[in-house]
């Protein structure tokens, strides 16, 4: 869009770190900028270490040098994404159980979440390697930094997919069919930010598919409760990933990448309340459909408090705070899991 190009040029020319020949960096807060994609869009303030690769972390301290780029491709250094992928699967298992969920299934889904989240991130890095080189947060990732080649990343992707397939084919056939059905969504998600301002919707469709597979892994068939659980998870993901996307909105606007953060701009906060309210409503309907008891509603209330706190307190122009609020969704995952399990007993 013409307005976006103009804004991108203004940001580039007014920040020496973004002039030609300089590495990309975050832009200073120079007041609210405007674009067709988001009224009153503020360019985020700079902060000391925008890169999501942190030298001296446990990967560098404890892993062999040759393995470190692969650990980072799989995001083993940043497990929050694995948790957010894993929880819907655990919820589905717990919702289908008549009491305590099967620990063997929980462990199997944990292995699947680690490998498939790693595979998804590797695929995303392959697709976005040229964009990532221009974004302050991602420019030091293994592909744009040259730590691995494209072929090495592709082979690592196949290795992870093989492990994921082994996990999937250890389940019943209903779960296998669902796992195969989601492959199209997994393959198309990395390209959605090029064509729509709502890639977060596609991420939600992907990340919460485990709710369906978790249920069928126990029961062998789909039903209304996991569908409602899945719907709630989609809205939850749209909310937390919109917060996450606000970290990169300055760079995204400059290089032409789309996100819900750009679409909503200064209207993000009220929309986060809407997304999270929709998630809680769908989860409540799932609990009703599954016949869960009082303790489920107590846990759901705790999740509601946490989800209300995020949009009420998030500083959407502070990338560090956006990351903190995004990571806080692990608490929602645990609260919902505890609520579903406890709801079978009281």
Region roles according to the model:
Residues 44-68, 121, 125-148, 242-265, ...:
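Cytosolic, membrane-interface loops and tails of multi-pass inner-membrane proteins
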Residues 63-68, 281, 285-346:
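Extended hydrophobic alpha-helices typical of membrane-associated regions
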Residues 83-92, 203-216, 263-266, 326-341:
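Small-residue-rich segments of transmembrane alpha-helices in multi-pass membrane proteins
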Residues 86-90, 94-127, 137, 161-165, ...:
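Membrane-embedded alpha-helical segments that form the functional core of polytopic membrane enzymes
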Residues 94-95, 169-171, 192, 216-217, ...:
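Helix-loop junctions at the membrane-solvent interface of multi-pass transporters
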